[in-house]
Amino acid sequence: MSAKRIVCLTEETTETLYLLGEQDRIVGISGYTVRPPEARSKPKVSAFINAKFDKILALEPDLVLTFSDLQADIAAELIRRGVTVLAFNQRSVAEILDMIHTLANIVGVAEKGRQLVAQMESGMKAIRNSASRFPTRPRVLFEEWNEPLISGIRWVEELIEIAGGIPVFPELRFQKNAPQRIVDPAAVIPKDPEVIIGSWCGMKVNKNKIRSRSGWSAISAVKKDHIYEIKSTYILQPGPAALTEGVMQLHAIFAHFNKMDVDPILRPGTLPNM
């Protein structure tokens, strides 16, 4: 199979195809796509959990790429209408790399896929080696949403460890669905995170709201003002951005915590909000 007309209903497959040099195959994208910027000129055919089916069909795709159970209803409807659908379900760093391999094979550029994966693995190895020189690996709370508080998304937890931190709720990474990763704010207090990182699914992180949570004034990250924001496009898409820009931003945060400079080759293109 070598799909020539592809609709990507999430950003990470769009970005992957661009990195593989196969962007001309893309005929439709999610309206939430921001990476790469030039992809925004493609026809927008969906949000995240709903899609414009007639618009998709009018594009005559030979493949539609979806993600996880969250887009299962979209996938089912497209299949009923005779469209070929491939649903990815990558939740870990290894699975993200597998997704890139798979997509490269589908479009007939397996060697480019291997090179891209090798480049990302090399970058993460360099960050892990750099992090090994930190005097302290801070305890880290990552928030993917604020009300309710949701934490522990697997690939982010793994990237935190690569970048030099220690997740305070490591057990949550094995829960695939967000409702299973809801955290009682009171349960955070005894964990005493030294760093809090917010990435609230496209909404700007309100640091004052974090500081004002009941009992959180006793938390080290709040007392010492180690509260940071990483925009969701860099970290919450399970794709190339998280394994490059996202992990570099995490590394920059932990270097800042340790009062250390980041090696210029590991410095992110966009700095997190510190």
PLM regions: where:
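N-terminal ligand-binding lobe of clamshell/alpha-beta domains
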Residues: 1-274
